[in-house]
Amino acid sequence: MSQNLESVKNLLVFLGKSLLSVLEALLFHVISKPRKNVAGEIVLITGAGSGLGRLLALQFARLGAVLVLWDVNKEANDETHQLAREAGAARVHAYTCDCSRREEVYRVADQVKKEVGDVSILINNAGIVTGRNFLDCPDDLMEKSFDVNFKAHLWMYKAFLPAMIANNHGHLVCISSSAGLIGVNGLSDYCASKFAALGFAESMFIETLAKKQWGIKTTIVCPFFIKTGMFEGCTTKCPTLLPILDPEYAVRKIIDAILQEQLYLYMPKFLYFIVFLKSILPIKTGILIADYLGVFHMTEGFTGQKKKT
């Protein structure tokens, strides 16, 4: 009898907490969730030399964060450093680092800890795309894609998570992709690496919860194509439902998600619906929807980022 009462009690507590969490979510759809203050926080951004990484750096500069900029391209990263100073950042530190190389990550991470301090917001943003069909993609390019888009996240967490745990304070941000949610023709290696990055970030979120490390937050970002040049030549058949995203808009949404400690951010919002449909519809129906949205052909014109001359 006592065991049955305990089971009923646990069920009622579970239902009560579930109801409260749903009501809280509904409330924050009506009013904006409070945003945390990141002034003085040490924010490390990989791939800060261009595109999304640079724009994120400039936004955090305006918010008063201490910036740690990593990029494999020293010249581009130095340019971001200068722009961040002009945007009002009090302290900016730029480091040249190839995040695909584990030992280099650990070496530069040690340098950051000595020269700047404990990183409290880590944004794994660096990424590359080959844009080739699987059988046309050289093995070394596929390996590089995995090294940058996924394995670098492992080394970055290994380097900076221990201090976050010790301080019970930190925020882990994974820039994944809509290609980490749904397979895309012509992006097999990219999709695989982004699926892996998302799965890893989600697993680490669960791990921090299981260990009651409440002060460590996670945000996982899955955007559709962004006009940064990385996916130059890619198209969308349905721009109303799946628009190619403006970089400034994307960065504003990412910053808001971080400041509100939002776990998942999909852009555009239609992606939430697509992921839901993928889980419940028959496969033939899903294929029809993908065909209607032009998913099979959106990368056929891919040219990728043009190198500056």
Curated annotation (Swiss-Prot):
Belongs to the short-chain dehydrogenases/reductases (SDR) family. Pathway: Cofactor metabolism; retinol metabolism. One of its GO terms (cellular component) is nucleus. Oxidoreductase with strong preference for NAD. Active in both the oxidative and reductive directions. Oxidizes all-trans-retinol in all-trans-retinaldehyde. No activity was detected with 11-cis-retinol or 11-cis-retinaldehyde as substrates with either NAD(+)/NADH or NADP(+)/NADPH. This is Epidermal retinol dehydrogenase 2. SUPFAM superfamilies: NAD(P)-binding Rossmann-fold domains. The keyword Transmembrane applies. It catalyses: all-trans-retinol--[retinol-binding protein] + NAD(+) = all-trans-retinal--[retinol-binding protein] + NADH + H(+). NADP(+) binds at residues 44-68. Its main location: endoplasmic reticulum. It is an enzyme of class 1 (oxidoreductase). The lineage of its organism: Eukaryota, Metazoa, Chordata, Craniata, Vertebrata. Its EC number is 1.1.1.105.
